[in-house]
A protein has these predicted regions:
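Alpha-helical residues within the helix-turn-helix
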Residues: 33, 50-51
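Short, hydrophobic-biased segments on the C-terminal half of alpha helices
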Residues: 46-47
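Short beta-strand "wing" residues that participate in macromolecule-binding interfaces
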Residues: 57, 72
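Glycine-centered, phosphate/nucleic-acid-interacting loop/turn motifs that mediate DNA/RNA or nucleotide
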Residues: 53, 59
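Short alpha-helical segments that sit at the start of domains
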Residues: 1-16
């Protein structure tokens, strides 16, 4: 596993987000509720996971969407 991916996974919230996305793509609002973390924290960690290449935006969604959807790469 590349070092950048390993760094992306060290945080418990990031690990939880990845766990939730393994079964299906999900919207950020769902991840906030399911992870039990504040919206800003989930948004921050989703951006970090996108930059590391662990997750990506679902087609038709993106950073400017009101409620972006993500999937595991």
């Amino acid at each position: 596993m590349p070092t950048q991916e390993m760094r992306a996974l060290w945080h418990p919230t990031r690990a939880r987000i990845l766990e939730l996305l393994k079964s299906r793509p999900a919207a950020r609002s769902y991840l906030v509720e399911a992870a039990g973390a504040p919206y800003a924290e989930v948004a921050y960690h989703c951006r970090a996971l996108c930059r590391s290449g662990c997750i990506q935006y679902v087609e038709g969604s993106g950073p400017d969407s009101a409620d972006p959807r993500y999937e595991v790469v």
